[in-house]
């Protein structure tokens, strides 16, 4: 029998110490990685619940194990809320991650060697959209589109490539693109060549849920997302679609048993909470502020003479090119880290440096907005970053910024009393 008094602190001091240090880091550091956010205590509570004990292969009402009557309720709540949130007819909440959701879509609708047309990783796409190092680029014939000289997706190029290569599937989505995707145009191109349209909205799902970014569900054959990032839930995946019995059956089979075994019902419970939170009016206010904050930060960088890819942002993120300053993303990332500002180095279009070094930084505002930053704080923060980038090896500047960061983080904590 287990005692509820046997906490991590009492049982494993080494692990507890690392967890406490991470909690302190999250409170004292400013988080600007576009794919990161902070979950609510309720989301974390669900992930640490007794639901982790239950194995439940199959789907609600059709399980391969007994004793699933209550996890069926949990999973159905998550399904129903996801469908309501995104206006979908179908939702599969079982994918363990966004990448696994994407892999399941390919498995469901493609055969090995089929052609897919996705956004180049070097131009802001994602590994799972056909990058050569990913299974999506190894199992399928991946053709890549990119952005033009103004940093915008070249839809004429997308159409030309689609007509030339006749892909079975066109993938719309990104990991580092700051503009609005033209879903009707993607749909028209897909229809022209008889391709499936698959949208990966992992980065903007929260914005979509709040109505501040176009919803791809009415246009796509299949939509996937992660449940963290802007959606502010647990780390996990989600597949959505309009009503289509054939596609729904293929998707369900591709997730289980095609690519996963038992679902993580404790994470699915956390997804259900996340979807409920996203259905509240205050979530829309939050997402509107996320975009305002990103625009405010990008504006400061432009004023200070830095190159923002695409010339600005219409969502939660933007890419800063440091080619003109001859600064590597790796060095800039490290310097900002010493100031307690967490970002990630990122390749930029026509980057002369390797993907491990890069000439750019990616910024995102979901996490700072969660802790209460508004335009004033974000402009101030962008100014501090510019000060560091202007003199990367000036430790006095870095030290001064670090003290300012610690002060504003103390004023605007992630988790209050």
From Swiss-Prot:
It comes from the Bacteria. PROSITE patterns: SHMT (PS00096). It is found in: Cytoplasm. InterPro entries: PyrdxlP-dep_Trfase (IPR015424), PyrdxlP-dep_Trfase_major (IPR015421), PyrdxlP-dep_Trfase_small (IPR015422), Ser_HO-MeTrfase (IPR001085), Ser_HO-MeTrfase-like (IPR049943), Ser_HO-MeTrfase_PLP_BS (IPR019798), SHMT-like_dom (IPR039429). (6S)-5,6,7,8-tetrahydrofolate binds at residues 121, 125-127, 354-356. Pathway: One-carbon metabolism; tetrahydrofolate interconversion; Amino-acid biosynthesis; glycine biosynthesis; glycine from L-serine: step 1/1. The record marks 228 as: Plays an important role in substrate specificity. One of its GO terms (cellular component) is cytosol. One of its GO terms (biological process) is tetrahydrofolate interconversion. Catalyzes the reversible interconversion of serine and glycine with tetrahydrofolate (THF) serving as the one-carbon carrier. This reaction serves as the major source of one-carbon groups required for the biosynthesis of purines, thymidylate, methionine, and other important biomolecules. Also exhibits THF-independent aldolase activity toward beta-hydroxyamino acids, producing glycine and aldehydes, via a retro-aldol mechanism. This is Serine hydroxymethyltransferase 2. Homodimer. It catalyses: (6R)-5,10-methylene-5,6,7,8-tetrahydrofolate + glycine + H2O = (6S)-5,6,7,8-tetrahydrofolate + L-serine. Belongs to the SHMT family. Its EC number is 2.1.2.1. The lineage of its organism: Bacteria, Pseudomonadati, Pseudomonadota, Gammaproteobacteria, Pseudomonadales. SUPFAM superfamilies: PLP-dependent transferases (SSF53383). The modification N6-(pyridoxal phosphate)lysine is found at residue 229. It comes from Pseudomonas syringae pv. tomato (strain ATCC BAA-871 / DC3000). Keywords: Amino-acid biosynthesis, Cytoplasm, One-carbon metabolism, Pyridoxal phosphate, Transferase. GO terms for molecular function: glycine hydroxymethyltransferase activity; pyridoxal phosphate binding. Its cofactor is pyridoxal 5'-phosphate. The keyword Amino-acid biosynthesis applies.
């Amino acid at each position: 029998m287990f005692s509820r008094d046997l906490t991590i602190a009492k049982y494993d001091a080494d692990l507890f110490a690392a967890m406490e240090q991470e909690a302190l880091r999250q409170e004292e550091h400013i988080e600007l990685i576009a794919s990161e956010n902070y979950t609510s205590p309720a989301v974390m509570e669900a992930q640490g619940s007794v639901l982790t004990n239950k194995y439940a292969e199959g789907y609600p009402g059709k399980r391969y194990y007994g004793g699933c009557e209550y996890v069926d309720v949990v999973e159905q709540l998550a399904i129903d809320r996801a469908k309501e949130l995104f206006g979908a007819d179908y939702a599969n909440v079982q994918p363990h991650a966004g990448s696994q959701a994407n892999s399941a879509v390919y498995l469901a609708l493609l055969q090995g060697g089929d052609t897919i047309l996705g956004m180049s990783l070097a131009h802001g796409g994602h590994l799972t959209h056909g990058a050569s190092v990913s299974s999506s680029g190894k199992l399928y014939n991946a053709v890549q589109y990119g952005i033009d000289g103004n940093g915008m997706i070249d839809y004429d190029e997308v159409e030309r490539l689609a007509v030339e290569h006749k892909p079975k599937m066109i993938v719309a989505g990104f990991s580092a693109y700051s503009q609005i995707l033209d879903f009707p145009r993607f749909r028209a191109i897909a229809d022209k060549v008889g391709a499936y349209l698959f949208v990966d909205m992992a980065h903007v799902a929260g914005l979509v849920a709040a109505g501040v970014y176009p919803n791809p569900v009415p246009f796509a054959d299949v939509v996937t997302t992660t449940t963290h990032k802007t959606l502010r839930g647990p780390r996990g995946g989600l597949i959505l679609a309009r009503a289509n019995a054939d596609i729904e059956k293929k998707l369900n089979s591709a997730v289980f048993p095609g690519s996963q075994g038992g679902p993580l019902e404790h994470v699915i419970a956390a997804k259900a909470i996340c979807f409920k939170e996203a259905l509240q009016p205050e979530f829309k206010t939050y997402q509107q502020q996320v975009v305002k904050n990103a625009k405010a930060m990008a504006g400061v960088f432009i004023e200070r003479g830095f190159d923002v890819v695409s010339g600005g942002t219409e969502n939660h993120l933007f890419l800063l090119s440091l080619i003109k300053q001859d600064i590597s993303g790796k060095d800039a990332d490290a310097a900002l880290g010493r100031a307690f500002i967490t970002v990630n180095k990122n390749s930029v279009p026509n980057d002369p440096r390797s993907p491990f070094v890069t000439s750019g930084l990616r910024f995102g505002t979901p996490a700072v907005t969660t802790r209460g930053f508004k335009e004033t704080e974000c402009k101030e923060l962008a100014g501090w970053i510019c000060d560091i980038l202007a003199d990367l090896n000036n430790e006095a500047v870095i030290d001064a910024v670090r003290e300012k960061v610690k002060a504003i983080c103390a004023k605007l904590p992630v988790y209050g009393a």
